[in-house]
Design a protein with these regions (language model features):
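N-terminal amphipathic alpha-helix/helix-capping segment at the start of soluble metabolic enzymes
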Residues: 1-18, 66-71
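Conserved, mostly hydrophobic/aromatic
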Residues: 14, 117, 173, 224, ...
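Active-site beta->alpha loop and helix N-cap motifs at the rims of alpha/beta catalytic domains
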Residues: 33, 48-161, 166, 173, ...
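Terminal or standalone catalytic/regulatory effector modules within metabolic enzymes
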Residues: 36-54, 291-296, 300-532
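Glycine-rich phosphate-binding active-site loops on the catalytic face of alpha/beta enzymes
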Residues: 117, 177, 223-242
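Catalytic cores of alpha/beta
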Residues: 156-162, 210-225
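Core active-site phosphate/anionic-ligand binding loop and the adjoining beta-turn-alpha structural block
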Residues: 215, 240, 248-251, 255-330
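Structured functional modules or segments
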Residues: 539-605
Length: 605
């Protein structure tokens, strides 16, 4: 008898692997009937991950969106599932236990059937509480194994992890191959090993970027996998997922029982996805995200990071080449920097304990590698700049790292007086719901049906306040308008070559900003050349001051929160003191004094 394999449409992840936003609730409600009409999905991923936060960012209520979006699937008998980050809930930072408990109650009440829980460190201590919270709320608990490829992430490692989760009460297991770098044969062995422990439902999630995932899908199905996550045009492949049509045809040929696809409905959904992209979502999707990229195999970074990674490269390449120009050194190309970055990821990753390269730890490893490359290209030492959130990972505050830290990292932590933590990560984050209840009462805000508004405020405080004030909607509409104008005014390569340019030119050691224009130009429209680094206070006399230069470019901040006191001109500092921050690559990076002395000027460009 043919063995059945069922499909799940990862509609939420399709969008967020391609760009920043997801469709609005009116668009979701419009497309849902056609997805149902396709007749081939047992499950649909409706929310979780960044879905709720993204709704807040464009000024919409995520609670209304989840309720209205899940409703038609329930009526059709299709299960809905969401992604959650265990200790981090629906955000990038740890969440108190009382907020985590409320999370599952709210989402079940809103219509989500299954919670797919993962810990970015594969620390089962962060996942196991979610099993209990999900069951208390009436949800199916699907626990994830974050797949990566390293000497310690073996078949035995993953089968043992699954065993611990099954013994703790997991209803299902997800093989979460978020970077698509799991090797097909090994993945098949993992599935077979889990099925020997218990005949539990297994769902395979993968991304297409490196090129392994079609072979991986076939291997896991032959080993007993029950559900396959799929995407569909025009958002499949590239940084997205294998396409439904291809997967269905392959598995049918291999002898599996798979559902038929209503192609008329498929074309309706396909055309609506394109319609939503043309509306505003396409403004946030790079055409390069449709491309496969085997360069990702060696560093193991998720394909969904490539858009932000290339933007980071462009910014940091400019900084490196400014440094080289001042010293009459040969410039570096983007390809050279990319290979240096990938090589540095390979160096950094084992030394910080082999964290699985999944959100947020993939960003941490990439950022740390980029910091090292920037520092070394500018004549400084590796590990000179490690952001606080990366230190939290290294010190064990987010969970136990799979591998051992390198002696050089341990020595640096001890030199800086940092303490390692091996307790339960949840203990670091006390309950906070009462605090948010009081704040909502003071603001006269309704806690919402099933306390769903209270939950959103506690999970995403800053974004929720921006949503309530209307600022989020205002900022979003302004950004959409700006992007539409930029798209309409996009220049051709020839026009770009002849476009007015602003350059930084070094004259006797002093950088000046100059405008270069082509053809007939009205001088009144040009900004006068000026010092590229305007002083905010009188600088020290020539020859007396020493520069402290940021190794990377970004947004300048004197402090990163209200609890810190900003440094001032005239203040004495010691070598190693934090003097300011540069926000780059989604992280506040501390800039430290390189000498003992007195601040004589604060300069920012």
């Amino acid at each position: 008898m043919e063995r059945e394999v069922k499909f799940s449409l990862v509609f939420r992840d399709m969008w967020q692997s391609a760009g920043k936003y997801v469709p609005r609730v009116d668009q979701l409600v419009k497309v849902a009937p056609a997805i149902i009409e396709m007749g081939c999905f047992a499950r649909v991923e409706t929310n979780g991950g960044g879905f709720e936060q993204v709704n807040l960012l464009f000024g919409e209520n995520p609670n209304r969106a989840v309720r209205e979006w899940t409703k038609p699937f329930h009526e059709a008998g299709i299960q809905t599932h969401m992604l959650d980050r265990a200790l981090n809930g629906l955000r990038m930072s740890p969440v108190p236990a009382d907020v985590r408990k409320l999370f599952y109650k709210v989402k079940h009440a809103q219509g989500t059937d299954i919670t797919r829980t993962f810990c970015g460190l594969n620390d089962v201590r962060n996942i196991i509480p979610s099993i209990g919270y999900a069951h208390e709320a009436g949800m199916i608990s699907q626990c994830s194994l974050c797949i990566t490829f390293s000497p310690i992430h073996t078949v035995e490692y993953y089968v043992n992890m699954a065993k611990q989760l099954i013994e703790a009460g997991a209803d299902e297991i997800c093989i979460k191959d978020m970077a698509g770098i799991g090797r097909p044969v090994s993945l098949g062995k993992i599935v077979a090993g889990i099925k020997k422990i218990k005949n539990i439902p297994i769902q395979y999630h993968s991304h297409a970027g490196p090129g392994f995932n079609m072979a991986s899908i076939l291997e896991v199905c032959q080993a007993g996998c029950d559900y396959i996550d799929v995407g569909m045009e025009p958002l499949s492949w590239g940084t997205g997922h294998a396409d439904l049509i291809s997967v269905q045809a392959m598995l049918k040929d291999a002898g599996f029982k798979v559902p038929e696809i209503n192609m008329e409905a498929y074309m309706k959904v396909r055309s609506m996805i394109q319609e939503f992209m043309d509306d505003f979502l396409g403004l946030y999707i790079s055409p390069k995200n449709r491309l496969m990229n085997s360069l990702l195999i060696a560093p193991g970074l998720p394909g969904g990071m490539m858009g932000s990674l290339m933007a980071d490269l462009e910014t940091n390449l400019e900084s490196i080449n400014k440094y080289k120009a001042k010293r009459n050194l040969p410039f570096m190309t983007q390809d050279e920097l990319l290979i240096k970055l990938f090589n540095e990821v390979a160096y950094v990753w084992p030394r910080v304990g082999y964290p699985p390269l999944v959100t947020p730890f993939s960003q941490y490893v990439k950022n740390l590698a980029m910091m090292n490359v920037m520092a070394m290209e500018k004549g400084k030492e590796r590990w000179g700049m490690i952001a606080d959130d990366i230190w939290d990972m290294i010190l064990g505050k987010a969970g136990r790292l799979p591998g051992k830290l390198a002696p050089e990292i341990i020595e640096k932590a001890e030199r800086e007086g940092r303490k390692f933590f091996d307790g339960n990560p949840q203990d670091n984050y006390p309950d906070q719901l009462e605090k948010y209840r009081k704040m909502m009462l003071e603001k006269q805000w309704d806690k919402g049906q099933d306390d769903e508004e209270l939950f959103e405020y506690a999970m995403h405080p800053a974004q929720y306040e921006a949503y309530k004030s209307g600022k989020a909607k205002e900022d979003f509409l302004a950004d959409v308008k700006k992007r539409r104008e930029e798209k309409a005014n996009a220049t051709t390569p020839v026009e770009a070559e002849n476009k007015t340019k602003v350059l930084t030119v070094d004259v006797n050691g002093q950088p000046y900003r100059v405008t270069v224009a082509y053809g007939a130009v009205d001088p009144a429209t040009l900004t006068a050349a000026s010092g590229a680094v305007p002083a905010q206070a009188a600088p020290a006399p020539v020859g007396e001051g020493k520069d402290v230069l940021s190794p990377l470019e970004g947004k300048f901040f004197l402090v990163k929160n209200a609890q810190e006191t900003p440094k001032k001109v005239g203040e004495k500092v010691n070598k190693g003191d934090v003097i300011c921050y540069v926000e780059a690559m989604k992280t506040y990076n501390a800039i430290r004094a390189e000498y003992d002395g007195t601040i004589t000027a604060i300069c920012a460009n």
